[in-house]
C-alpha cells in the first residue's frame, strides 16, 4: 500500500507505541461463514461504522460533558469531528487529529469516573446503533464455533464494555496511560493502521489461530493491513478507496444499513 505524507508524519510516533497493546477478554452467501471454514480460526471486526453506525468514542461526548469531563470547546470540536466522520470517514490525517484531540481532552480525568460513566450510558448510546446485519453476522460466527474479536482504534475503556455487550471473546483497542488513578494524556498503545495487523498476528500466534482461515471486517482504507492479514477479508459500507481495492481484489462487499435509530445527529447536538 502506498504511504502518503500524512501517514509518514506519524509513523515514528506509532512505532514507539508498538507491541504494548494487550488483549482484553470479555465474558463472552459468499461472505457468510460455514462450519467447514473453521479450524482454530477467528473473526476480527472493526467497530465504528462496521458493527455500529457511529463513532464509539464520540458517542460519549454528551455524558462526559454533563459530568464535567469535557468543556464546551471540547464539545464543539467533537461535534465538528463527528460531522466530518459521518460525511467522509476517517483517513490517516483525520485519525491523527482525533488522536491528538483525545489525548489533550482526557488529561487529568479520573479513570474510575470514566469507567462509571461508560457503564451507566453504554446501552443507551451503543445498542440503538448496532447494525442488525452485524448482530446476525456475529451470531453466525459464534454458532460456527469461531472466536469473535473486536479490533478498534477507540479506547479500551469504551471498547471492552462494548465487546462484552456484543458477546465478543476479546478486544484489541487503544490504551491510554493511567498514573495515580488519572489519565496522563499519553498513549501506551495506539491500535491503528498497521498496528492492528501486528496485534492480530500476535494474538493468532498466542491462541493458535490459522490466519488463512480467519475473517476480518472493516469499512475503512486505514484498516487495509488488518484485512490483508487474514485469508477472508470482507468490507462493510466501505469508503471509496477501500471499495476500489475490494473490487479489484474480488473481496466481498457487504452493505449494513439497519440500525434501530438514525445516528445523523453529531455529538453534543442531540436533544437531552
Predicted regions and their residues:
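A metal-dependent, Asp-based hydrolase signature
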Residues: 56-57, 69-140
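Active-site neighborhood of HAD-like aspartate-dependent phosphohydrolases
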Residues: 30-90
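C-terminal cap/substrate-recognition subdomain and adjoining C-terminal extension
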Residues: 13-16, 20-34, 38-40, 116, ...
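Intrinsic low-complexity/disordered segments
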Residues: 4-5, 15
Amino acid at each position: 500500500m502506498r504511504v502518503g505524507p500524512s501517514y509518514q508524519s506519524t509513523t515514528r510516533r506509532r512505532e514507539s507505541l508498538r507491541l504494548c497493546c494487550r488483549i482484553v477478554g470479555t465474558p463472552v452467501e459468499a461472505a457468510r461463514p460455514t462450519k467447514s471454514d473453521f479450524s482454530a480460526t477467528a473473526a476480527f471486526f472493526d467497530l465504528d461504522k462496521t458493527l455500529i453506525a457511529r463513532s464509539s468514542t464520540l458517542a460519549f461526548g454528551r455524558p462526559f460533558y454533563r459530568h464535567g469531563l469535557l468543556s464546551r470547546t471540547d464539545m464543539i470540536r467533537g461535534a465538528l469531528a463527528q460531522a466530518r466522520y459521518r460525511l467522509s470517514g476517517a483517513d490517516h490525517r483525520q485519525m491523527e487529529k482525533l488522536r491528538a484531540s483525545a489525548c489533550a481532552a482526557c488529561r487529568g480525568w479520573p479513570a474510575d469516573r470514566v469507567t462509571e460513566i461508560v457503564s451507566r450510558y453504554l446501552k443507551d448510546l451503543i445498542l440503538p446503533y448496532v447494525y442488525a446485519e452485524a448482530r446476525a453476522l456475529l451470531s453466525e460466527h459464534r454458532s460456527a464455533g469461531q472466536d469473535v474479536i473486536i479490533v478498534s482504534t477507540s479506547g479500551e475503556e469504551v471498547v471492552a464494555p462494548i465487546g462484552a455487550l456484543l458477546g465478543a471473546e476479546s478486544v484489541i483497542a487503544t490504551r491510554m496511560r493511567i498514573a495515580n488513578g488519572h489519565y496522563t494524556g499519553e498513549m501506551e498503545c495506539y491500535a491503528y493502521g498497521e498496528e492492528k495487523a501486528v496485534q492480530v498476528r500476535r494474538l493468532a500466534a498466542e491462541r493458535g489461530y490459522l490466519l488463512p482461515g480467519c475473517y476480518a471486517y472493516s469499512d475503512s482504507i486505514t484498516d487495509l493491513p488488518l484485512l490483508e492479514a487474514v485469508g477472508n477479508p470482507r468490507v462493510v459500507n466501505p469508503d471509496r478507496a477501500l471499495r476500489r481495492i475490494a473490487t479489484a481484489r474480488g473481496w466481498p462487499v457487504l452493505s449494513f444499513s439497519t440500525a434501530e435509530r438514525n445516528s445523523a445527529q453529531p455529538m453534543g447536538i442531540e436533544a437531552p
